[in-house]
A protein has these predicted regions:
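Predominantly a Rossmann-like dinucleotide-binding segment in NAD(P)-dependent oxidoreductases
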Residues: 1-59
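Short, hydrophobic secondary-structure boundary micro-motifs
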Residues: 10, 59-60, 131, 159-161, ...
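Contiguous beta-strand/loop segments that form the cofactor/metal-binding neighborhood of enzyme cores
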Residues: 39-115, 145-156
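Active-site loop of classical SDR/Rossmann-like NAD(P)-dependent oxidoreductases
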Residues: 132-146
Length: 184
């Protein structure tokens, strides 16, 4: 639906997955899980890669650190004709929605976007706005997100491609190596 031009050309995708986690949690242990990026980055990468593809030009990270892990990280991707960003946090909270901006309108998926059963297509003229309801099938956050994005794009269910998986690991690797990571 979105790739067919319902919101025009996609120029931006923004997704967030955050939770406030106890500082004593094993998720906050740098030796075990490594913080927000290690715990949650794969989830917001799914809609970004499904909508814009895996051939981004570069990525920059901004992280708030604490106890040796990232409590919050914002990643910004630059594509040839679009940008994308995500926020992940174990020690900071955001709305948790997904917004896909286009040249004619935008798609809004309310928080928590990975569990939602509907999304909205919104335009400058609010009389044209539409809500679409989507019944989830199956279990597992990763599969729900993938199925949701696939159905929005094509009305079909597709598996995560090998290329998408490899590029997700490339993003994690870039972050873990400290490439283009700025501490805030």
């Amino acid at each position: 639906m979105l790739k067919s031009g319902a919101i025009g050309e996609i120029v931006d995708v923004n997704a967030s997955v955050t939770t406030l986690t106890d500082e004593q949690s094993e998720k906050m242990d740098s030796a075990r899980f490594g913080g927000s990026m290690s715990e949650n980055a794969c989830f917001p990468l799914l809609p970004i890669f499904k909508l814009l593809g895996t051939d981004y030009r570069d990525v920059t990270f901004y992280s708030k650190m604490g106890n040796g892990v990232d409590l919050y990280t914002k990643a910004v991707f630059r594509y040839d004709k679009a940008v994308a960003s995500f926020q992940v946090g174990l020690g900071a909270k955001t709305e948790g929605n997904l917004v896909i901006s286009g040249t004619k309108g935008y798609a809004y998926v309310p928080a928590p976007w990975w569990k939602t059963d509907y999304f909205e297509i919104r335009y400058e003229d609010q009389n044209l706005n539409k809500k679409y309801f989507y019944p989830f099938a199956g279990e597992g956050l990763r599969y729900e997100i993938k199925d949701f994005i696939s159905s929005v794009l094509q009305g079909t269910f597709q598996k995560l491609s090998r290329r998408e998986i490899v590029r997700m690991t490339d993003v994690q690797d870039c972050y873990l190596k400290g490439e283009t990571v700025y501490r805030i």
